[in-house]
C-alpha cells in the first residue's frame, strides 16, 4: 500500500523506501508469465510509480524457498535481476542460510549480469556457519544480519557471529537489523479467546528499539568501537542504497 506508507512517512518524518518485486508466496495469476514481462512491471514501479500513484520504488526484492530456488521463484529472481540491470537499483534477497540457498541465488544473478556489490543477502544470521557467510561476502555481496531477536539462533550468538565477521575484516559490508513485524493478525488461543497482545510483541517487546537496547550494548561489551557501530548501522546501509 504505497499511499499508506507515504502517509506514515510524512506523519513520522521517517524516509520509507518502497520495494518492488515479490516475496515468497508466488501468486497463481503470475504462473506462466516470463521473467522479462515481470521485469517490465517492476521497472514501471521504479520509473513511473506504483499503479495509480506517483510513488516510486527505490529497491528491488526477490525470495527463495526453504531448501532451494523453486522454478517459479527462479523466474521471479531473474525478473528482479533484469530490473536491477536496467535501473541500477540495489537488490535485497530473502534467503535461507540453513540450506545455503544463496549459492543458487548468486549463480542466477551472475548469469543475469547483476553487479553483486549491489546485492544484500538477508536473514543471514539464522546460521552461525561463518565459512558460508564469508563465501557470500567474498562474492561481493552485502550481508543482511537482520533477524533480531530471531528464533533459530539466540540473539547473543547472532551478535557473536557479527563480531566474528567484523574481526575477519568484513565490517564494511555487514547490515544488522530487525526484520521486525509490528502489524499482524491476532490469532485466537486454543480455548477460542483472543490474546491480549500479539505473539510478535511477546517475542520482541522492544520491536524497532531492539537493536538500540540489546544489540549495540552487546557489541560494545565485545569491544566493538563507536566508529565500527557507525559503520554497521549508518555508513553501510547508506552505501548499499547509494551504490
Segments and roles (model prediction):
Residues 7-10, 15-90, 141-142, 147-152:
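Active-site gating/metal-coordination segments in enzymes
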Amino acid at each position: 500500500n504505497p499511499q499508506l506508507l507515504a502517509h506514515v512517512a510524512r506523519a513520522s518524518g521517517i524516509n520509507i523506501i518502497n520495494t518492488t518485486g515479490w516475496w515468497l508466496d508466488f501468486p497463481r495469476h503470475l504462473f506462466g508469465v516470463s521473467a522479462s514481462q515481470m521485469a517490465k512491471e517492476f521497472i514501471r514501479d521504479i520509473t513511473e510509480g506504483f499503479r495509480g500513484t506517483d510513488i516510486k520504488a527505490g529497491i528491488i526484492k526477490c525470495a527463495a524457498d526453504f531448501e532451494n530456488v523453486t522454478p517459479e521463484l527462479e523466474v521471479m529472481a531473474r525478473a528482479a535481476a533484469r530490473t536491477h540491470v536496467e535501473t541500477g537499483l540495489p537488490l535485497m534477497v530473502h534467503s535461507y542460510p540453513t540450506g545455503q540457498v544463496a549459492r543458487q541465488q548468486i549463480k542466477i544473478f551472475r548469469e543475469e549480469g547483476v553487479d553483486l556489490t549491489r546485492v544484500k543477502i538477508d536473514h543471514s544470521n539464522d546460521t552461525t556457519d561463518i565459512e558460508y557467510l564469508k563465501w557470500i561476502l567474498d562474492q561481493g555481496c552485502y550481508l543482511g544480519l537482520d533477524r533480531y531477536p530471531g528464533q533459530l539462533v539466540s540473539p547473543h550468538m547472532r551478535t557473536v557471529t557479527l563480531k566474528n565477521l567484523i574481526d575477519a575484516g568484513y565490517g564494511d559490508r555487514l547490515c544488522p537489523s530487525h526484520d521486525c513485524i509490528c502489524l499482524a493478525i491476532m490469532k485466537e488461543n486454543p480455548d477460542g479467546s483472543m490474546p491480549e497482545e500479539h505473539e510478535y510483541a511477546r517475542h520482541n517487546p522492544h520491536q524497532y528499539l531492539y537493536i538500540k537496547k540489546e544489540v549495540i550494548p552487546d557489541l560494545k561489551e565485545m569491544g566493538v568501537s563507536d566508529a565500527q557501530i557507525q559503520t554497521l548501522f549508518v555508513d553501510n546501509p547508506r552505501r548499499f542504497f547509494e551504490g
